[in-house]
Amino acid sequence: MTIALGRFTKDEKDLFDIMDDWLRRDRFVFVGWSGLLLFPCAYFALGGWFTGTTFVTSWYTHGLASSYLEGCNFLTAAVSTPANSLAHSLLLLWGPEAQGDFTRWCQLGGLWTFVALHGAFGLIGFMLRQFELARSVQLRPYNAIAFSGPIAVFVSVFLIYPLGQSGWFFAPSFGVAAIFRFILFFQGFHNWTLNPFHMMGVAGVLGAALLCAIHGATVENTLFEDGDGANTFRAFNPTQAEETYSMVTANRFWSQIFGVAFSNKRWLHFFMLFVPVTGLWMSALGVVGLALNLRAYDFVSQEIRAAEDPEFETFYTKNILLNEGIRAWMAAQDQPHENLIFPEEVLPRGNAL
């Protein structure tokens, strides 16, 4: 019996090959397989947001005006979350709530779930796009891995947190002032600024900004002069073999400033990747904890002493009183459907009163 060994070749391309050729063709804007997820989802998410902020009221869900049509501006317009009574309904246009009525769907807050879900999948599609392009040009996938940080924050804040609460109502609405309101809510109801995961997130984001500024300034300061113009930006070839700036000079400078400095570019740039991405991951993890109503730091001994001694206060006890004030004022305004009424005697007061 004869066994023939050889590479199997198809006589003609099947549908997958044809699609693969078209999707991954070299063009001005790369499409790719990831584009099948990215472009439709990004289009619908942005389109839903522009539609909602332009035309759709939040009167039926929050008792608020939230569109340009009602007199809002860019900072106050928003696509608002559904009412608390709708819990975690996906609010599909053809679902039992709207029953195919587009106007009713908008009134119920259907655009929020539409924007949130398409936005989440659009971000995932963008990360897959970075994976796909990195593989095509034989790069490492660290860009895509880094982008998982913003995705983790978006998913934890807009999806996981409200899933842990009573409904989508408690997620942020998609608007500038709406996000500010949500931040105040997080502080008042969760004491978010004293949460160690928030602290790690702040350290990561601000630390990354510091590293970025230091790195950019250092590279600019140590550029090799390679042109007769005052501006050296165009004096270098993207395919050049030699260095554009002097790592040795930069190392010597920062060694004199701090006593320590990065000795190679790999560790330096990995650190610049590690700091912000880890900060974003940690803050996302903290929001998942808040979804389960986990507490931040509680310094109970200080609270007890402040309650017993009118002359004893710390910045912590003052912040706790501020949080009580946020809850007392915000709950009644933010959740009108609960008909919350707080008597004067339960409203927070400073220890000196």
Curated annotation (Swiss-Prot):
Self-association and partners: PSII is composed of 1 copy each of membrane proteins PsbA, PsbB, PsbC, PsbD, PsbE, PsbF, PsbH, PsbI, PsbJ, PsbK, PsbL, PsbM, PsbT, PsbX, PsbY, PsbZ, Psb30/Ycf12, at least 3 peripheral proteins of the oxygen-evolving complex and a large number of cofactors. It forms dimeric complexes.
Binding-site residues, chlorophyll a ChlzD2: H118
Binding residues annotated for Fe cation, in chain numbering: H215, H269
Organism, as annotated: Nandina domestica
Binding residues for chlorophyll a PD2: H198
E.C. number(s) listed in UniProt: 1.10.3.9
Protein family according to the UniProt entry: Belongs to the reaction center PufL/M/PsbA/D family.
Sequence positions bearing N-acetylthreonine: T2
Gene Ontology annotations of biological process type: photosynthetic electron transport in photosystem II
Topological relation to the membrane, as annotated: Multi-pass membrane protein
One Pfam family, short name: Photo_RC
Entry keyword Electron transport: yes
Membrane spanning stretches: 41-61, 125-141, 153-166, 208-228, 279-295
Gene Ontology MF terms in the entry: chlorophyll binding; electron transporter, transferring electrons within the cyclic electron transport pathway of photosynthesis activity; iron ion binding; oxygen evolving activity
Protein name: Photosystem II D2 protein
Textual note on the cofactor: The D1/D2 heterodimer binds P680, chlorophylls that are the primary electron donor of PSII, and subsequent electron acceptors. It shares a non-heme iron and each subunit binds pheophytin, quinone, additional chlorophylls, carotenoids and lipids. There is also a Cl(-1) ion associated with D1 and D2, which is required for oxygen evolution. The PSII complex binds additional chlorophylls, carotenoids and specific lipids.
Record field: catalytic activity: 2 a plastoquinone + 4 hnu + 2 H2O = 2 a plastoquinol + O2
Role description: Photosystem II (PSII) is a light-driven water:plastoquinone oxidoreductase that uses light energy to abstract electrons from H(2)O, generating O(2) and a proton gradient subsequently used for ATP formation. It consists of a core antenna complex that captures photons, and an electron transfer chain that converts photonic excitation into a charge separation. The D1/D2 (PsbA/PsbD) reaction center heterodimer binds P680, the primary electron donor of PSII as well as several subsequent electron acceptors. D2 is needed for assembly of a stable PSII complex.
Enzyme superclass (EC): oxidoreductase
Compartment(s) where it occurs, according to its Swiss-Prot or TrEMBL record: Plastid, Chloroplast thylakoid membrane
Keywords: Acetylation, Chlorophyll, Chloroplast, Chromophore, Electron transport, Iron, Magnesium, Membrane, Metal-binding, Oxidoreductase, Phosphoprotein, Photosynthesis, Photosystem II, Plastid, Thylakoid, Transmembrane, Transmembrane helix, Transport
Cellular component aspect of the GO annotation: chloroplast thylakoid membrane; photosystem II
